[in-house]
């Protein structure tokens, strides 16, 4: 038993010795192995602090990569570098905007420059020897394999095998926006623009002849340039760089103003236009593919391409485009481009697109210069000569053809000698704002302010007894076939004929009038549109005044026909003087008026005859005066001598003889200083009062007027006045504006007897000067609304006309004690109270 136990102990000891020896041997191998790796690590061209911390796998990986690089360098047949080249090598990486990477045909990174840490956050020894597919985006692997493939097939004659490579690669990046390094598991994707070529090395030349031929070594040499984000551009942009923003369809939504100096475009004219309109045609395919990569990978660099300048030629541009994503839904929002212009304008005299022809063919001078040259050019060019000139410049023909939507206006500057003046001035706009036509018909009146020649005579009217005279033509006069002298506030010297046969009236030229006005010390500004009108035959250049033109355009020319039936919200009190209800009277027809008898001289404050005249140049205003008649010889003598500057506006509505004497009625309670408001209707009212005395068969309006005028002002109730005003306003809105109506009377000029004048408070009035056959009798007509004018001016052959009562008169007047007396005001109220 003891012998068996001793044998077992011996076996145990021998096994322990063997194990110990094995452990020692393994320890020795590991130590030797470590020494070898240590020595090998120090043989690598790496810094000591890096090589001393490498594990065995990294040492082996880096050693293999080093050997491959040495093999490539030896196969390249590079000469030994001198000291100068060795010193320059350290500046290459600083000059590059990226890092260098060498890949084998399997995708192993044989070499990568040490500045990769600056752009990607990963160190050189962490990437060297690894497969590139371990650090790139999975969607880019297929494209990467295609780039690594070198096709050795037959090449067509005359063509070389394309070994150039340019593509975009998304690679892992451990750098944060603040420059810190994160874990590889949290890395983001960064777009690299990889450019380079495939290089094939033949390694058999340096190998000994042993009967074994190795395949050539293929590698891809790349320069990888990361594309900076527009928000993280560290280098400030110079004057040769401009920014632009585009929509997803590549249309400009913003452009930097520096493009004007570089390419000639204004930022405003690029907005809304596609960037493809400005690409050179030969670069469009390349840029289209680049834009596809941009939407796929987020960022691209276009490389150098040609972009068309505005006035011809092109410039070389390189663009870095970045897709900006929405932070909420991660959808693409817009595209921001940083454009680097790397050259000046090349072939600036060469046109590449239609957009460049717009700026080339556009004239430099302004539109005002063009219109001036168009109207001042007298000699006409031959059409054949013009056609020959245009054939030499075919590009200019595109500017001559009208575009869609253009308005074609035919300009005919040639005038036929046989063309009448009526046809030439057929469409001249007439500013009919002085004497207004009837509201019942649209009148075609040639006013004095229209630029009609003085030789044109008005058409003869129908019979003066026609009641439609006021509705058809209110300003045309039935006169002999003589030219009419037309006048307004502009002072003119008029020559009256010595005999009825010599009845032509001559106007002084506008040049003379303006000269006289300038020389007058108290020269006043024009007061009517007629002062801006010139004779067509006169020289417009000599009489053209800028001040007159400015005032002409300041005139109110809107209301061509103020009596048109249109609703207005204007208050009547803002348009006409206040006329109380108790001053109303029944309108009479014109045929019931009789010659007036003069009983007393007219007081200065009340004028019975409404006349219109022009005073001296110092006071060019229209006033109403009361005058008496003068003999024919005295009127002719004063007219011939041209001693009077007063211009009397007269008209001849009928052939009825006008009485030679005038008179006035007794002033009413509202006249003079007792009047609330000076009313222009007083004159006409007083004329009709005197007419009642001469016509026994007519209505006795004088008694009615006296009854109303005796009502004291303080007896009127304010409520009654307000109700009366409202009723009057409705009546005036229906019948027309009564403040235009003026009294009917005669105005004859008498030398030496000038009554005091009173300014009219209503609108401007226009009249004609007409000469009767005897040349002495003259009349004045003031136009009023057509409905009232028919009653005032309408001639009736029946002398026994019945009174015409309106619905308004029927409402407020109660006929008692005969039809001659109508109650008004308080008397009407008392009568109604008695009836009730």
UniProtKB/Swiss-Prot annotation:
Activity regulation, short description: Induced by reactive oxygen species (ROS).
Start and end residues of each stretch annotated as ID: 589-795
Glycyl lysine isopeptide (Lys-Gly) (interchain with G-Cter in SUMO) crosslink location in chain: 391, 476
Segments for region (ODD): 401-613
Region annotation (Required for heterodimer formation with ARNT) ranges: 170-191
Annotated crosslink Glycyl lysine isopeptide (Lys-Gly) (interchain with G-Cter in ubiquitin) location: 545, 551, 560
bHLH domain ranges (all copies): 17-70
Molecular function as annotated in GO: DNA binding; DNA-binding transcription activator activity, RNA polymerase II-specific; DNA-binding transcription factor activity; DNA-binding transcription factor activity, RNA polymerase II-specific; DNA-binding transcription repressor activity; E-box binding; histone deacetylase binding; Hsp90 protein binding
Tissue: Ubiquitous.
Top-level taxon of the source organism: Eukaryota
Comp. bias intervals (Polar residues): 608-620, 652-678
UniProt-annotated stretches for the region DNA-binding: 21-30
Positions of modified residues ((3S)-3-hydroxyasparagine): 813
Domain PAS: 80-155, 228-298
Annotated stretches, region: Interaction with TSGA10: 1-401
Residue ranges of the region described as CTAD: 796-836
PTM comment text: S-nitrosylation of Cys-810 may be responsible for increased recruitment of p300 coactivator necessary for transcriptional activity of HIF-1 complex.
Subunit structure: Interacts with the ARNT; forms a heterodimer that binds core DNA sequence 5'-TACGTG-3' within the hypoxia response element (HRE) of target gene promoters. Interacts with COPS5; the interaction increases the transcriptional activity of HIF1A through increased stability. Interacts with EP300 (via TAZ-type 1 domains); the interaction is stimulated in response to hypoxia and inhibited by CITED2. Interacts with CREBBP (via TAZ-type 1 domains). Interacts with NCOA1, NCOA2, APEX1 and HSP90.
Protein name, UniProt field: Hypoxia-inducible factor 1-alpha
